[in-house]
Regions:
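Active-site environment of divalent metal-dependent phosphoester hydrolases
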Residues: 39-41, 65-71, 88-91, 148-150, ...
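Active-site neighborhood of phospho(di)ester-bond hydrolases with catalytic His/Asp-centered motifs
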Residues: 34-37, 58-68, 82-85, 142-145, ...
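Short loop segments at secondary-structure junctions
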Residues: 28-30, 79, 86, 156-158, ...
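Accessory terminal helices/loops
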Residues: 192-200, 207-258
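Conserved N-terminal glycine/acidic-rich loop preference
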Residues: 23, 33-36, 43, 57, ...
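A structural micro-motif
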Residues: 55, 79, 136, 198-199
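Active-site HxH/HxHxD metal-binding segment of metal-dependent hydrolases
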Residues: 43-44, 48-126, 130, 226-228
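Catalytic core of the metallo-beta-lactamase
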Residues: 1-53, 57, 116-186, 190
Length: 258
C-alpha cells in the first residue's frame, strides 16, 4: 500500500490489489474517507497512516456497492458509511452480495480475515446532492453504468474529483451485473464538466490523473464504447490498457452486454 498527497487536504491510498484507491479529504478539523484498500494488513495500517497525517476520518463514503469499495468498515468499525440511494437499494435487493464476493476474492488470493464484513450503520444519501464537511460541501453526482448504482464525489475547494470506477489509466470500461453502455455514456457526460473544473481526478483503480490526462482518458473511453457497441472482438485498446487482462475484460463486456 502506498499513500500520496495530491493536495494539502487530500491523500490517496492505493492498495496492492488492482491499484484500488481510497481517498481521504479534509476540511478544517474534519476528514472523510472515500472507498477502501483491500488487504487486511492495509486496512489495519490505514487508521495509523491517516491519523499521523491529520486525516482521521469522522465518516466513510463508498462510491458504489461493489465489495472492493465497501471495506472501510473493517478499518473503522465504529464509523457510519454513506451510500448513494441507489447503492442502498442494491444492497437491499441483493442481501449478502458484498460479503459473498469478498469471501470468494479472499479464497482466490489466500487471504484470511479476523472478522467478516459488516456494513453496520449506513446513511442513505440523495444523489445528486451535497454533503457537508467542515465549512465546505462535497458534491455528489450520479455515476451509474459500470454498475446500476454509484456516485462521483467532487470537492470543489480542493479541485478534486473522486469518480469511482471510471477514468482509470489501468482499466478499460467494464460492466458488472446491471451495468449498461447507455448509462456509462451518461456518466461520462456528467463527469466531463467536473473534470474541467478539477485539478486532480482519482479513479477507483489506478493513479490520480491531472485534468488534461483525465480528459484524454474520457475520450479514450468513449472511443472504446463505440467499438464495444459495434461488437468489435479485437478493438484497439487505449495506451497503457492493452494487455491480456484488459482483453479478457473486453470479452467479458461483450458477453455481459450481448
Amino acid at each position: 500500500m502506498r499513500a500520496v498527497s495530491v493536495h494539502p487536504d487530500a491523500i490517496v491510498v492505493t492498495s496492492l490489489l488492482w491499484q484500488t484507491t481510497a481517498t481521504a479529504v479534509r476540511a478544517g478539523d474534519e476528514a472523510m474517507l472515500v472507498d477502501s484498500p483491500y488487504f487486511p494488513e492495509e486496512l489495519e495500517l490505514l487508521p495509523t497512516v491517516l491519523a499521523q497525517s491529520g486525516f482521521e476520518p469522522s465518516a466513510l463514503l463508498a462510491t458504489h456497492g461493489d465489495w472492493d469499495h465497501l471495506l472501510g468498515r473493517l478499518a473503522f468499525p465504529d464509523l457510519s458509511i454513506g451510500l448513494a440511494e441507489g447503492t442502498m437499494l442494491r444492497i437491499r435487493e441483493r442481501p449478502g452480495e458484498a460479503q459473498r464476493s469478498l469471501r470468494e476474492a479472499d479464497a482466490e488470493h489466500y487471504v484470511h480475515r479476523s472478522r467478516p464484513l459488516a456494513l453496520g450503520q449506513t446513511q442513505s444519501l440523495p444523489v445528486p446532492g451535497h454533503l457537508g464537511l467542515g465549512e465546505h460541501e462535497l458534491q455528489l453526482h450520479p455515476a451509474e453504468g459500470h454498475t446500476p448504482d454509484g456516485m462521483a464525489v467532487f470537492a470543489p475547494w480542493l479541485g478534486l474529483l473522486v469518480c469511482g470506477d471510471y477514468l482509470s489509466d489501468v482499466e478499460i470500461p467494464m460492466f458488472n451485473e446491471g451495468g449498461s453502455v447507455e448509462e456509462y455514456r451518461a456518466t461520462l457526460a456528467r463527469l466531463a464538466p467536473l473534470v474541467d473544473r478539477a485539478e486532480t481526478v482519482v479513479p477507483g483503480h489506478g493513479s490520480p490523473s491531472p485534468r488534461e490526462r483525465a480528459l484524454e482518458l474520457l475520450d479514450e473511453d468513449l472511443s472504446y464504447l463505440d467499438g464495444l457497441e459495434r461488437g468489435d472482438e479485437k478493438p484497439r485498446l487505449p495506451r497503457g490498457r492493452d494487455d491480456a487482462r484488459q482483453r479478457a475484460i473486453h470479452r467479458e463486456n461483450l458477453t455481459e452486454l450481448g
